[in-house]
Structure formats: structure tokens, C-alpha cells
Design a protein with these regions (language model features):
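Secondary-structure-rich domain cores
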Residues: 45-52
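Conserved catalytic cores of very large enzyme subunits
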Residues: 1-37, 54-281
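Short amphipathic alpha-helical heptad-repeat segments
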Residues: 38-45
Length: 281
């Protein structure tokens, strides 16, 4: 959670200072930025919790309890995990102006365990949990990014088995019933993916619910291995954006510009009438 990231950064700063104090200016700026950023996030969560505590809404106690947990640690329930993802998205997109091009690291994998725990503990019933997932998906349909908000499902476990589970089908069923096309869903599949996990999205596509991209795990993992990356490191790569892929916590890619390869030709044919020289092109 946000709290854990800040505490880990504090620990690493202390460890670094003990080894080679004083910190360099760049190191100090790095640790200071984490402290400032995550302390601000935790203050925001605290303020939201205080508002929930004085709200008369029937939903307020659940919201307050969720935010109280995120103030001090990692999420433990399905609702808390969804809230963490949503807060991260809103802070990145609306405060940092930084696009969030996925939701979680395989949403079905991220939600399967807390869903089962919530059911077995009696904390929430199945309908409530389905509603949480549905409302979560509807947030991004309402935001309506014209390029779509990606999330991915599926993948491959470390032992080579299919990572899909009952939560995969549950998310697809909820998405299907809502009849939305945003978020757009990426399906990580491989030759050993059981048919039921592919038949569901294919059936949806035939009925016009077609906001899907299929990503072949084997080919992508092989492309990593061809560059010297081990299977153990590559098997849980992330999918983001349209259908780009990246080693989890191992890449930082950017797309800051569009290159118009036709422009120099057009300018040359136009005889550079605006006064530009070849060198300035």
C-alpha cells in the first residue's frame, strides 16, 4: 500500500545514510520526493476518511473502514484493493498528469484471493462483491477516455500453468452484463489456456461486446528469453496501453512524440517556401 511504500523508502534512506552519509544531492532529492508524495497521499486518504465518518450515507461506514485501512497498510479486502487501484489512477491521472495504462497486475489474479476471503469470512456476500467489481468497471466507462482504459486478465504461472481462474470468468460476466466497452480488456493466453476462458470473450465478441485484445503469452515470453531474460523473470510480464508489454518493475517506457516521416518530403517538394533550410529540417 501507499503507507508501506513510504516506510520502505524511509528504511532504505536510513540504510543508505548509515553506509555512506551524507547522501548525494540526487539521492536526497529522490528520497525527499517519495516522502513528500506519499505523505501527501496519506493525508488525502485521511481527509477522505474524515468526510466519510461524518457522512449520513448508508455506504459511509464501509468507505470509512476501507480508507482507514489504506492509511496504515496494504489492502486486505476486495473493496480495499479496488479502492487502492482507483486512488492510484485518480492521483496519477488528475494530479501528476501521468497516464495509467493498466489496472492492477492482472485484475483477475489480484482479486481472486480477497474475493474468496471476503466470502469465507462472511464480510460481504457474493452479490455485494459483484457490485463492487461492477461499480469499479463503470468508473472508467464514465470517465470515457477516448483511447480506452486498459486492463488485462490471464497469463502464465511460474510452473507454466494457466493463470486464469474463476475470477476471470466472473469479471467477464460482469463486464458482459454491463454492456460497456471501456475499460478495454486484454486477454493473455497460451496454447494450454482452457477453452472456457477463450470461449467466453469470443462469444461476447460475436454479440457485439468486442472491446478485447488477445495477447499470446508464449510469443512474448519467447521474445524476452531471446534477449537473455529468464522465464522466471519474464513469465509475469505486464501488459499496458494498447497491447504493449514490459517486464514487471523492470522497464520504464515513454512515447513522448509522434514522428511524421512524410513531413520532410512534403517540405522538400514545397521548396521550403517558409524559409527553412535543409539543416533546420
Amino acid at each position: 500500500g501507499f503507507y508501506g511504500i513510504r516506510e520502505r523508502a524511509r528504511y532504505m534512506r536510513t540504510k543508505r545514510e548509515r553506509r555512506s552519509y551524507p547522501l548525494t544531492p540526487s539521492e536526497r532529492a529522490y528520497f525527499d520526493s517519495i516522502e513528500i508524495e506519499y505523505s501527501a497521499i496519506l493525508r488525502l486518504i485521511h481527509r477522505l476518511r474524515e468526510l466519510a465518518e461524518i457522512s449520513e450515507s448508508d455506504k459511509a461506514p464501509t468507505i470509512s473502514s476501507c480508507l482507514a485501512r489504506l492509511e496504515v497498510g496494504a489492502p486486505t479486502t476486495l473493496y480495499e484493493r479496488l479502492m487502492l487501484i482507483y486512488l492510484y489512477f485518480m492521483l496519477s491521472e488528475s494530479v501528476d498528469s501521468y497516464q495509467v495504462r493498466s489496472l492492477g497486475s492482472g485484475l483477475d489474479h489480484d482479486l481472486a484471493e480477497p474475493f474468496a476471503n471476503d466470502l469465507s469470512s462472511g464480510r460481504f456476500n457474493e452479490n455485494q462483491l459483484d457490485d463492487f467489481i461492477g461499480y469499479f468497471l463503470m468508473q472508467f466507462s464514465a470517465i470515457g477516455n477516448y483511447w480506452g482504459q486498459p486492463l488485462y486478465l490471464g497469463g502464465t504461472n511460474l510452473d507454466g500453468s494457466c493463470r486464469m481462474n474463476d475470477m476471470t470468468l466472473r469479471i467477464l460476466d460482469i463486464y458482459d452484463n454491463l454492456g460497456i466497452y471501456n475499460p478495454k480488456i486484454q486477454i493473455k493466453y497460451s496454447p494450454n489456456t482452457p477453452d472456457k476462458y477463450l470461449e467466453k470473450p469470443l462469444d461476447m465478441i460475436r454479440r457485439g461486446h468486442s472491446s478485447f485484445v488477445f495477447v499470446c503469452d508464449d510469443n512474448i515470453i519467447d521474445s524476452f528469453r531471446a534477449r537473455g531474460v529468464s522465464f522466471e523473470r519474464a513469465h509475469d510480464y505486464d501488459v499496458k496501453g494498447c497491447y504493449e508489454f514490459a517486464l514487471r518493475a523492470g522497464e520504464f517506457s515513454t512515447a513522448p512524440i509522434y514522428i511524421n516521416l512524410l513531413a520532410p518530403i512534403l517540405r522538400a517538394l514545397d521548396d521550403c517556401s517558409d524559409g527553412d533550410s535543409f539543416e533546420t529540417l
